[in-house]
């Protein structure tokens, strides 16, 4: 196993020298190192057979070694003439001629000859200087033996590959002798097409001893990505991808930002991930644009603050805003991914905060000026542009220090050359930059005179975000609208003490009339206070409820009784109407008495003990109960049935001789109906009413309101009795029971039916 590993390590060393450059051109591109099998086989002199798994492990091991040997240098980008290729092809043809032709994969001598002839024919037509050709050839072939690529992580340096090991072709353009041009070097193998490698200065740079080593791109030190050289389009695993994100600088500071609740990171920064250095020296008075643009020739052409309407195509910049040039340090425009850190110098962790100067105004008010700007459309637009647009950013509102969170962030990537805009500062305000090859221009745009700070626009639903409170800035004094406490509400002229005194007097009246606060509802309390103070106290419900609770605690016991005819109710009886208590016989009987007195000629209500007495003692036990009443002259008889734990109702309609059973749980007690039928027959014989001795029918009513708990059966029975006696429909349900209980309590205390 060790021997096998040593062999693979040696193969990796040879494979690392197959191609030494990557393609960059100033952009974010991966490092492409593919396996140059033909040169490897030519060096080893024997067939090489190894499976994919061994290749994968060998590639991973060699990747770590190569990465440690990288040296920061200028990228290689050279352009030369075709004549140099003649020498390279000649050396290649001599290198290719080996005894064993089976070591090559797909190339043949014929293809090499055709390629050489093609390059020679194209080289004859060019008239270029030979000095640059020789310099380039020398720069390409003369690699120092002790270079970083010649050593693999401190191991013994090996022989550098000769020019014949690299089949290359050179493409170039004519240049003046005094001009430091660029050279493009194309390296080919026998399997793939040519690869064009990175950009650099001319061969004069490498003549001074600078090695031709690929430049390691200057990424952000916190976001430096390490890629394996032998991973061509190899997809990173999800674990490694998430690990890199968690180790990034963004997520290290995200928790601190959330705790401080200063702002949220914009969507653009979450996507791009790479921060550029903040340029504060040129943007103290306003926001800076992340897009490169030359300095304005006229210093008077400074951009003024401009607030358009909801159209986000206008341009806004600070009074002293300065547009930095992204090429001042030699970095390419596409070399770094753009973020909003450059656009707003005061931005922290992806959130922009623009502090508005309050020195000129004593109160925190908005003052907007309408400006008209014209922007000329550029004649030429670049093919690729990066557009970032954020609809709402953070802003500090003067002395109130009110901060609104970012509501909507969007990023658009356009290849058709659309306008580039960045909108910020709590509204659809934008910044535009147009890339025109190597020059960028920043112009002000818009002919809109409407102010975004007008109340009409701010009231529009598109100007509001569901994640933040609406911002009201119509020239009036800015108030605290974040907490929505007492500051945002209209001050009440009634103080707490005055309200407490009035409320205590009202509760005294309720206690005197009803003996308790059970029948009192919230609507009645608010209505009484409104009648007294002519003001709505709905916003002070917590204070009112607290006062009522304290009052109830001070008046727990009250000697209160109700007398009606022969009935008497005390506080224990009335307490059964509170909450989910079961009604007792005293409440049922007294309320039945009120119903019977409401329609005395039509309805007769039997006592709740009637059925129990009838079952236990028979007809003789209840014979004298109707001594003074002729039941057959009534139209409706109401008989409550109390079965210890449940209340039901039996009604007798004398006009059609029907005995009906009403139960709020859908139960039918046939023996109860049969007992009432026998009683009526006996009563008809005793009172000499032969017409009621026959024709009796029984019925069970099912389509009636039903209870949904185990405590409101007595309330349902009383409601059945009232509706039947007053000939009202059953328009109540379980949800109405709390209200019905309070109403029954009041009716018992006032000894009359209210409706």
Curated annotation (Swiss-Prot):
Subunit annotation: Interacts with CCAR2.
Cellular component, GO, one term: postsynaptic cytosol
Keyword Cell cycle: yes
Biased composition (Basic and acidic residues): 272-283
UniProt source species: Homo sapiens
Keyword check for Lipid biosynthesis: no
Protein name: Sentrin-specific protease 5
Cleavable signal peptide: none
Family statement drawn from the similarity comment of this UniProt entry: Belongs to the peptidase C48 family.
């Amino acid at each position: 196993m060790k021997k096998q590993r040593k062999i693979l390590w040696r193969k990796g060393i040879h494979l690392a020298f197959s191609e030494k450059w990557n393609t960059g051109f100033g952009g974010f591109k991966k490092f492409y190192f593919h396996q140059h099998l033909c040169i490897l086989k030519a060096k080893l002199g024997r067939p090489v057979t190894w499976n994919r798994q061994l290749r994968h492990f060998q590639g991973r091991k060699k990747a770590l070694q190569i990465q440690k040997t990288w040296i920061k240098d200028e990228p290689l980008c050279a352009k030369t003439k075709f004549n140099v290729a003649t020498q390279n092809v000649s050396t290649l043809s001599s290198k290719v001629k080996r005894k064993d032709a089976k070591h090559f994969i797909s190339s043949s001598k014929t293809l090499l000859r055709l390629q050489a002839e093609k390059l020679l024919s194209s080289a004859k037509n060019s008239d270029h200087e030979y000095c640059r050709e020789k310099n380039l050839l020398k720069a390409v072939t003369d690699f120092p033996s002790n270079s970083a690529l010649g050593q693999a992580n401190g191991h013994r340096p090996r022989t550098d590959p000769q020019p014949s090991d690299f089949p290359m072709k050179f493409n170039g353009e004519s240049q003046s002798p005094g001009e430091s041009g660029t050279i493009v070097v194309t390296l080919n193998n026998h399997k793939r097409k040519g690869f064009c490698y990175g950009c650099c200065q001319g061969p004069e740079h490498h003549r001074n001893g600078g090695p031709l080593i690929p430049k390691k791109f200057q990424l952000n030190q916190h976001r430096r990505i390490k890629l394996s050289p032998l991973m061509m389009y190899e997809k990173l695993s999800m674990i490694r991808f998430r690990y890199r994100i968690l180790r990034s600088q963004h997520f290290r500071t995200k928790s601190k930002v959330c705790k401080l609740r200063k702002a949220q990171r914009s969507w653009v920064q979450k996507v791009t991930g790479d921060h550029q250095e903040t340029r504060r020296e040129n943007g103290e008075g306003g926001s800076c644009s992340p897009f490169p643009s030359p300095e304005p020739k006229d210093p008077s052409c400074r951009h003024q603050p401009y607030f358009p309407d909801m159209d986000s195509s206008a341009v806004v910049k600070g009074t002293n805003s300065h547009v930095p040039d992204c090429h001042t340090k030699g970095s390419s425009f596409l070399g770094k991914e753009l973020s909003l850190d450059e656009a707003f110098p005061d931005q922290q962790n992806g959130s922009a905060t623009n502090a508005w100067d309050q020195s000129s105004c004593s109160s925190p008010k908005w003052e907007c000026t309408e400006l008209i700007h014209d922007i000329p459309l550029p004649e030429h637009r670049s093919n690729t542009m990066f557009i970032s647009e954020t609809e709402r950013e953070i802003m500090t509102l003067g002395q109130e220090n009110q901060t609104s969170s970012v509501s909507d962030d969007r990023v658009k990537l356009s290849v058709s050359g659309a306008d580039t805009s960045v909108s910020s500062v709590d509204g659809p305000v934008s910044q535009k930059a147009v890339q025109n090859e190597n020059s960028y221009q920043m112009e002000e745009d818009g002919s809109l005179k409407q102010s975004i700070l007008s109340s009409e626009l701010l009231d529009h639903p598109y100007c509001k975000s569901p994640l933040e409170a609406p911002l009201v800035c119509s020239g009036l004094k800015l108030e605290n609208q974040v907490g929505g406490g007492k500051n945002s509400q209209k001050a009440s002229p009634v103080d707490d003490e005055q309200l407490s005194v009035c409320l205590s007097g009202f509760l005294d009246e309720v206690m005197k009339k009803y003996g308790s606060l059970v029948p009192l509802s919230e609507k009645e309390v608010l209505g009484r206070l409104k009648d007294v103070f002519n003001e709505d106290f709905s916003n002070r419900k917590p204070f009112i409820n607290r006062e009522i609770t304290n009052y109830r605690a001070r008046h727990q016991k009250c000697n209160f009784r109700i007398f009606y005819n022969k009935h008497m109710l005390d506080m224990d009886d009335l307490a059964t109407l509170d909450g989910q208590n079961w009604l007792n016989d005293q409440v049922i009987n007294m309320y039945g008495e009120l119903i019977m007195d409401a329609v005395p000629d039509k309805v007769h209500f039997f006592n709740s003990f009637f059925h129990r007495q009838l079952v236990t003692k028979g007809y003789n036990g209840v014979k004298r109960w109707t001594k003074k009443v002729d039941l057959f002259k009534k139209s409706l008889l109401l008989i409550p049935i109390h079965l210890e734990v449940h209340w039901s109702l039996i009604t007798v309609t004398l006009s059609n001789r029907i005995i009906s059973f009403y139960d709020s749980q859908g139960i039918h007690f046939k023996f109860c109906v049969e007992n009432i039928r026998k009683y009526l027959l006996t009563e008809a014989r005793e009172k000499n009413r032969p017409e009621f001795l026959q024709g009796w029918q029984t019925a069970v009513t099912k389509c009636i309101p039903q209870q949904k708990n185990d405590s409101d059966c007595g309330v349902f029975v009383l409601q059945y009795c009232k509706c039947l006696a007053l000939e009202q429909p059953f328009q109540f349900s379980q949800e109405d029971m709390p209200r019905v209980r309070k109403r029954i309590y009041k009716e018992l205390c006032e000894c009359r039916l209210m409706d």
